[in-house]
């Protein structure tokens, strides 16, 4: 079983990976946009991680408002990367993503919305299909004035729904470079201001559980979730 705390970010360079380790992370999910996916780029990042005993896993974020394009991209990248995210915001995309157990994380469901992007029905779907909801701390930091308060309200609302319906939640730094990297304690401290400490601990550990689940499904003896070949 995979243990530790893992960040979700867009950091691929050697200095950034060393900074993540120095800040106290056990590993990270390095995420590329699906339109810019490069196997060489992620392999290089994984190698940087191995050189400093830091675990780097591959991720792709699918960003499109077209549902058919999104579903095609999910099929294309599901077996190429460890973690699959889909950018939310559009209510139809939010719902469809939470119906798909091939997707790991619904990223920023509140993006460009006046509401939080989720309701009790969608939260239940996420719980049923093991699709996590992302709190992107980087987006919160980069926003200003009313936009920041709106995102913070969306976080609080989505946390309330997710806790009630046992929907997985992850928090990410969303860092693009060393200047956006945050220590685990910083993210945990923020979570403690919007949720109780036990729930905050659960959230900070969820990313590693998602990675562990996907690694389990890649085992050759696993035919599908809950069904595997047992050798006598």
Swiss-Prot record:
Protein localization: Cytoplasm
Thermal effects: Optimum temperature is 36-38 degrees Celsius in the absence of L7Ae, 48-50 degrees Celsius in presence of L7Ae.
A biological process from GO: tRNA 5'-leader removal
GO molecular function, one term: ribonuclease P activity
Taxonomic source organism: Methanococcus maripaludis (strain DSM 14266 / JCM 13030 / NBRC 101832 / S2 / LL)
UniProt cross-references to HAMAP family, sorted A to Z: RNase_P_3
NCBIfam families associated with the record: RNaseP3Mthcoc
Reactions catalysed according to its record: Endonucleolytic cleavage of RNA, removing 5'-extranucleotides from tRNA precursor
Gene Ontology cellular component annotations, sorted alphabetically: cytoplasm; ribonuclease P complex
Role played: Part of ribonuclease P, a protein complex that generates mature tRNA molecules by cleaving their 5'-ends.
Matches recorded under Pfam families: RNase_P_p30
Record's subunit section: Consists of a catalytic RNA component and at least 5 protein subunits.
Alphabetical keyword list: Cytoplasm, Endonuclease, Hydrolase, Nuclease, tRNA processing
Family listed: Belongs to the eukaryotic/archaeal RNase P protein component 3 family.
Name the UniProt record assigns to this protein: Ribonuclease P protein component 3
Source organism superkingdom: Archaea
